[in-house]
């Protein structure tokens, strides 16, 4: 169990695994339902459609492989599939998080209160509605930060050779970091921590955050498991917040 006192930060793998346990806590499960439903509808529908299109998309991607790399086509084909899953999964994960942002924030708040014994501000439907403009402004901040970087990486996919070798690795690392930002931001935002300050705080635990984001990214690509990943990641990130940053940044005790 995570405590409210300052503890030695653990690995991102630990916090990701904790997320799967924390979503089942009595009293927390009811706050998991709405984020879970949003994720099931969006990710389930999106990946069903994606798998009906892969037969057409992958040959199109492989057509950009230069002649001098054709001898590696048997290795590049699975890389192309993984690339499509990574990009597609990240974009739809971002969309799902946009829609579920108010409910993810509420889940993070209630879990933090459960883990620490602290008393959160009064919440509920009216509280969520009141906070929606601020929450969506925060989502726009994240989008404005990530979109230019994502566009640069997507352009690399169209460069012969680089697009089939280096670009997928760079995209995976980028999506891992962005997913760490996405999910860790919920408890930070609950305490009105500025976006820039939040990113600086995450950099103090780079390895743990990359591990956490990488696992979240991988599970986003796996059918069935990806339907449950949103509330799991929110809970894991909240546990990390309690251990690593709450003592310094908490607005309510």
From Swiss-Prot:
Q: Which UniProt keywords apply?
A: Amino-acid biosynthesis, Cell inner membrane, Cell membrane, Cysteine biosynthesis, Membrane, Sulfate transport, Transmembrane, Transmembrane helix, Transport
Instruction: Give the source species.
Output: Salmonella paratyphi A (strain AKU_12601)
* Subcellular localization(s) per the UniProt record: Cell inner membrane
Q: Which family does it belong to?
A: Belongs to the CysZ family.
> What gene is this protein a product of?
cysZ
Query: A GO CC term?
Result: plasma membrane
Q: What does this protein do?
A: High affinity, high specificity proton-dependent sulfate transporter, which mediates sulfate uptake. Provides the sulfur source for the cysteine synthesis pathway.
Q: How does it sit in the membrane?
A: Multi-pass membrane protein
Major location (coarse): membrane
Identify the domain of life. Bacteria
Name this polypeptide is given:
Sulfate transporter CysZ
HAMAP family xrefs = CysZ (MF_00468)
Question: Which Cys pairs are S-S linked?
Answer: none
């Amino acid at each position: 169990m995570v405590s409210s006192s300052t503890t030695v930060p653990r690995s991102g793998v630990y916090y990701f695994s904790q997320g799967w346990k924390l979503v089942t806590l009595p009293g927390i499960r009811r706050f998991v339902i709405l984020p879970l439903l949003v994720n099931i509808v969006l990710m389930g529908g999106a990946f069903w459609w994606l798998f009906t299109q892969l037969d057409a998309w992958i040959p199109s991607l492989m057509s950009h492989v230069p002649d001098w790399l054709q001898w590696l086509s048997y290795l590049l084909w699975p890389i192309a599939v993984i690339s499509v899953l990574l990009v597609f999964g990240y974009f739809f994960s971002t969309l799902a998080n946009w829609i579920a942002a108010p409910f993810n924030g509420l889940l993070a708040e209630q879990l933090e209160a459960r883990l620490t014994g602290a008393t959160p501000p009064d919440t509920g439907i009216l509280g969520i509605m009141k906070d929606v403009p601020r929450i969506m402004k925060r989502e726009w901040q994240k989008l404005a930060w990530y979109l230019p970087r994502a566009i640069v990486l997507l352009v690399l996919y169209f460069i012969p050779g680089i697009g089939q070798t280096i670009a997928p690795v760079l995209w995976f690392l980028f999506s891992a970091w962005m997913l760490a930002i996405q999910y860790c931001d919920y408890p930070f935002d609950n305490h009105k921590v500025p976006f820039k300050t939040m990113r600086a705080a995450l950099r103090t635990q780079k390895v743990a955050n990359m591990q956490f984001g990488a696992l979240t990214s991988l599970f986003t690509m796996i059918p069935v498991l990806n339907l449950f990943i949103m509330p799991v990641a929110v809970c894991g990130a909240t546990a990390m917040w309690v251990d690593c940053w709450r003592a310094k940044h908490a607005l309510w005790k």
